[in-house]
Structure formats: structure tokens, C-alpha cells
Amino acid sequence: MRIQQAKIITTVTALLLALSPIQTQTLEDLEFGTEETLDIITWNIEWFPKNGATTTGYVKEILENLAGDVYAIQEIDDTTAFKTMVDLMEDYEYVLMDGWFGGLVYVYNSQSIEMLEAFEIYTESQYWSPLPRSPLVMKFKYQGEVLYIINNHYKCCGDDYVDWNDDGDEEMRRMIAGTLIEEYMSEVLEGERVILLGDLNDLIDEVASTNVFGGFLEEPEKYRFADWDLATGGVSGWSYPSWPSHLDHILVTDEMFEELDGENAVVEAIDVASNMGGWYQYEANVSDHRPVGMRVELEPNTMVEVLSEVGRKTLVGMTDVLGRECPYERGKVMIFRYSDGSVSRRISLSESQPE
């Protein structure tokens, strides 16, 4: 993350937030979802409920008025309060895993969404360092179309430097987390409509040497961050105003590029604070993150993909970080060379050699 840049503008941003006048708008004026669109929202609610019943009242009203089809939520602390709140919401259900709980949940509109199954991945202890909260996957139908959504909350903090020799380095942990999830998406969910979202705790627009999302960004024909324009736009549109940065992301696979490019597609960090008296009222009672929403018109997934060897990128060789030819080794930092001339430095945790 751009630590120094963030420090420079944090004080100014905080002052502007503090001086913002109380708005005449209320939570009743909030809106995002429509009946004609698939409306997906990710939101870190910051250890819900941070201010008890006051928080649950606000959050219930916010969720209802935003009218999302699916909410991927992070940092649920009190599961009893969460369940009680959702039970009071008409037409909404929740997904919450039993056993050890990492704060990840879904809330979905049962009138528009048919929940097919939900499960966690990478639950074994060997994955706890890069993925301290096991990714929560939900398979669902919307208007007869099947989609997968993966909710996660990456490890925070760091020093804006990826230490390739230290698996405990915060940036390295986030990079390995992305590698694991990308491998699951490409090996298990290939050809499916998949959405990865959550508080991923880093910037997507950094230079390659410090960008922990390289595994996705290096394959633009397969993956796209729906919130790219937010991340590269002005601070007023970012998801984490307290320490001005954009950390909450929505990534889609190529099966949803057409929808994302649609003329009615919308992606935004929703400014709830303006509808409840200003930022400090919001932060004290709800969260320090803004929800990030994606609204798209879903088209039938009837396209038949025909892959030919012409133009298809395939792996042609591997070297270690010193440039020496070497065989594939699981968990080792390697340089992958492809038939189109591109190269990628990555860690593969697959048991077999990637293609």
C-alpha cells in the first residue's frame, strides 16, 4: 500500500470529513439495487455490532434500503445479534458457517436469489497464515443463471514491500492468498461465472513489484476488477476514508465481462454517511468502511467457448528467481514463461504443474 501517500492526505481528509455539514438526507433516501439488475455488495461492518442495538438498527435499515440481492459481509463479531437482525428483515436470509468463525457471512434476498450451496475452502491448518479467514463460497441462481461468489478478508497491514523470502510477511501472505483463490477459481470453477470480493486489504493499482494481486492482473483476459475505476479515481470515491485508500474490491471472471461493460452497469463505494448525519456518526455506530456495490444486467450464459491452439497462452518453461531452468516445485517462487512471450513471477501451490 502507498503508506507515505496515505499519511500525507489522512489529516486533510479527516478534517474535511469533520467539517462536512449534516445532510438533510436520511437512510430512507438510500438506494442502490433495482428489480431489473443483479446487485452485489461487499461490506466490512467492523466488528458488528460495534455499538450494540444502535448498530443493529442502523445496519438493518441500510441493508433493506440498499436493496441488494447478495451482501458479502466481513467482521461479524456477535453471530447471535447478526442472526436476530436478519430474522427481522423481510425476504432476506443469511449464510453463516458453524464451527470456528472468521466473521464472514452472506445476506441474500430469497425472492431473487436461489441459494444452492455454501461451503468454505482452504480450511486446513497449512493455509491459516495466508488465509486466516477461510474463503466462504456460495453457489446460487439468479434468473435461472448459476453464479459463484467468494467472500474473503485478507490479512491487513505491511510495509509496502513484498518479501519473497518470508511467508510471514503481510504482503506475501496476501499474495499467497490470491494465488490460492485464483488456483481454485481456474481449476475448480473454470467456465463458471465467479465473483471474488471482500476487504482484500491492499491496493489493486500499485506497480507490479509491490502489487499483491499480480496473479489476477497478469491475466486480463480471464479476470477484471470491477472497481478499477474507483481505485484509480479520486479519494472521495474510495471505500476506506479514515485512512484514505481503496481496500474493498470486486473481481469478476471473463464470463461476466459483457455484463460489466453494459451501459447500465454501476460500481460504486456507497456513501452511507451522507445519509445519517456525516462520517463520524457513521463510523461511531456502523463501520469505518463504505460498502462497495456492483449492479449489472445479467445475460443468459449461452456462449459456447471454443479454444484453439492458435492464440492460446500455454506454459513453455520455468526458471527459479535467478533465471536458472528448473522443474516445477510446489510452493516455490518461480518464473513462468508462456507461448505468447509473457512472463509471470508467482508461487503455485497446486500439486501438479500448471499448464
Task: Pin down the residues of each PLM region.
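Extracytoplasmic, non-cytosolic globular domains
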Residues: 52-71, 87-88, 125, 133-237
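C-terminal tail/sorting-segment detector
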Residues: 333-355
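Metal-dependent phosphoester-hydrolase catalytic domains
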Residues: 25-29, 79, 128-132, 186-195, ...
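N-terminal, active-site-proximal structural segment of metallo-dependent hydrolase catalytic domains
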Residues: 2, 22-89, 93, 99-103, ...
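Bacterial N-terminal signal peptides
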Residues: 10-20
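Bacterial N-terminal signal peptides that target proteins for export
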Residues: 1-10
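Structured beta-strand-rich core segments of catalytic domains in phosphoester-bond hydrolases
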Residues: 76-155
